[in-house]
Amino acid sequence: MHETRDGVVKHVGQVEGVEVPSGTATVRQVLIGPEDEAHNFFLRRFTMGEGGSMPLHTNRVEHEQYVLSGAARVRIGDRVHEVRAGNALFIPAGVPHSYEVIEPPFDFLCIVPAQPDAVALVELADPERS
């Protein structure tokens, strides 16, 4: 990593990946975060392998995402989108969203505000129980 008074430069290979607890075959790297003294935004990279998924959930903060490789079905609210390398996504705060890999590795950058976040899993109503 190369640090200067004016910023931080690092290679993705220098950043430890951490399994996403609620995900399947999903790793998150915080490329730019609080330890880098970023005050407005954090930059994260997610890599999802074969069979990778993240369940329907909400976040307290919005997400801006850019797909680097692979393809996935991404649910945002009530709509399902098939996204692939080159697609950009905006997920507003509080909107339920999920991911299901269809072409691994599904690799994307995710920018979030430098604010406290909370993740909440969303359960869908079971029509059999209604």
Positions of PLM-derived features:
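Conserved short histidine dyad/triad with adjacent acidic residue
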Residues: Q29, R44-N59, A93
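Short acidic-glycine-tyrosine-enriched beta hairpin
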Residues: D78-A93
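Well-ordered beta-strand scaffold positions
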Residues: F46, A71, R79-H81
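Glycine- and acidic-residue-biased ligand/ion/polar-headgroup-sensing regions
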Residues: V61-H63, V67-A72
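Short beta-strand His + acidic residue motifs that chelate non-heme Fe in jelly-roll/DSBH
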Residues: P55-L56, V74-R75, I91, H97-E103
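A short, N-terminal "cap"/entry segment at the start of jelly-roll beta-barrel domains
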Residues: M1-N40, L124-S130
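A short hydrophobic beta-strand segment most commonly corresponding to one strand
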Residues: R45, F90, P104-A120
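A generic "binding-loop/recognition-motif" signal
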Residues: G52, R60, R79, V95-P96, ...
